[in-house]
Amino acid sequence: MVSQAAKILDGKALAQKIQLSLKEEIQTLQPKIGRPPGLAVLMVGDNPASAVYVRNKEKSCTKVGMASFGRHFPGETSQSELEQVIEELNQDSRVDGILIQLPLPDHLDGIALLHQINPEKDADGLHPTNLGRLVRGEPGLRSCTPAGVMALLEEYNLEVKGKHAVVIGRSILVGKPMGLMLLEENATVTIAHSLTQNLTELTRSADILVAAAGKANLITPEMVKPGAVVIDVGINRIEDESGKARLVGDVDYEGVAEVAQYITPVPGGIGPMTVAMLLSNTVYSYRQKEAGVERQKAGGN
């Protein structure tokens, strides 16, 4: 049993709440649009972890009343074949969101494939157009994991404005958009990475600490400011003494929970929120279809 002072930020509970809200919205919109929202998930190869993630996404789609179009391709599928499939999905009126499940085999250019996706169907929120909208503070599809972090902070009424937020990791998937979203909410943001010299000094000054480095138990109790909010984005598979695999984050959970005021667990913290934001992005695109239907009706009167 963990002896902890920190309150748990329950991503699983909030994700369920968001999914219920999306389900109700879909039930309202579907009669007007004439179909359910649709999410296409492309997976290449036979990565077992990816297969689990894809199944979880498909189950979540079913739960909220969304159609899922899973496309599984052999590991040797070519770049041009996938680009052709993406173009077909861009044109498919049943599809509101397109997701490429990562990682991809080494011979594929994931960035080029991402660029191929219609920005209005970019369920992951990673297309340059959507990242540009984020930089400009304009509405649009947001990167799922950072958006999940922001939703969790909001749910627990945790103040971001004026706080010092330190993000560890600078990936396009999490670190960079995370920094931008915190900045948008008027935090003072520092992004640390593998070449940062004074990591402990920075993390100890953080009111909000987001760990997204992909390194198991990187953040130890002495690196955390007492009373901080600690968000653990890391998902690392390690083996215990018996050789059994288990998932841990980037944060030494048991130790840091005695120092922080709020903390996310792994699993059950940011993982479920990422999926909830993926569904939310797809419904965001679907919602635009209703606006199009209403405009058509107005034009026909």
From Swiss-Prot:
GO terms for biological process: L-histidine biosynthetic process; methionine biosynthetic process; purine nucleotide biosynthetic process; tetrahydrofolate interconversion. Pathway: One-carbon metabolism; tetrahydrofolate interconversion. One of its GO terms (molecular function) is methenyltetrahydrofolate cyclohydrolase activity. Its EC number is 1.5.1.5, 3.5.4.9. It catalyses: (6R)-5,10-methylene-5,6,7,8-tetrahydrofolate + NADP(+) = (6R)-5,10-methenyltetrahydrofolate + NADPH; (6R)-5,10-methenyltetrahydrofolate + H2O = (6R)-10-formyltetrahydrofolate + H(+). Signal peptide: none annotated. Homodimer. Belongs to the tetrahydrofolate dehydrogenase/cyclohydrolase family. This is Bifunctional protein FolD.
